[in-house]
C-alpha cells in the first residue's frame, strides 16, 4: 500500500475541532492501515510534523433505507493523531478552526 493512499480525508466534526486545541488531528484512513503505517503516512504527507501517538477507531456500518430497500454504509477507520510538542501544526485544519 502506498503511503499517500493511507489517508483518505480529514474528519471535520465538533468533537474533532475541540480535540485540535489539544494537538490531536482526526483523519479517515484506509481500513487495512495499521498504526505504524498511519504514522509514516502523516509524517510523509506533512512537512515538519512529528507524530507522538496514533489511536485508531473502527467505525461500524450504519443501516440506511432508500424507500423500502435497506442497505448499509461502508465501514471506515478513523485515526486520531497526537503530535509532539516541538512539531509544526498541520495547515489543513487551520481554515476550519477559525
Curated annotation (Swiss-Prot):
List the GO terms this entry assigns under cellular component, sorted alphabetically.
ribonucleoprotein complex; ribosome
Provide the species name: Streptococcus pyogenes serotype M1
- Gene Ontology biological process terms from the UniProt entry: translation
- Is RNA-binding a UniProt keyword of this protein? yes
- Gene name, Swiss-Prot/TrEMBL: rplW
Record-level Gene Ontology MF annotations: rRNA binding; structural constituent of ribosome
- Report the superkingdom from the record: Bacteria
Assembly mode: Part of the 50S ribosomal subunit. Contacts protein L29, and trigger factor when it is bound to the ribosome.
Q: Does the keyword RNA-binding apply?
A: yes
Fetch the PANTHER family from UniProt: 60S RIBOSOMAL PROTEIN L23A (PTHR11620)
Give the family, as the similarity comment puts it. Answer: Belongs to the universal ribosomal protein uL23 family.
Q: What role does it play?
A: One of the early assembly proteins it binds 23S rRNA. One of the proteins that surrounds the polypeptide exit tunnel on the outside of the ribosome. Forms the main docking site for trigger factor binding to the ribosome.
Q: Which InterPro entries match?
A: Nucleotide-bd_a/b_plait_sf (IPR012677), Ribosomal_uL23-like (IPR013025), Ribosomal_uL23/eL15/eS24_sf (IPR012678), Ribosomal_uL23_CS (IPR001014)
Q: Which Pfam families match?
A: Ribosomal_L23
Query: Which UniProt keyword terms apply here?
Result: Ribonucleoprotein, Ribosomal protein, RNA-binding, rRNA-binding
Q: What is this protein called?
A: Large ribosomal subunit protein uL23
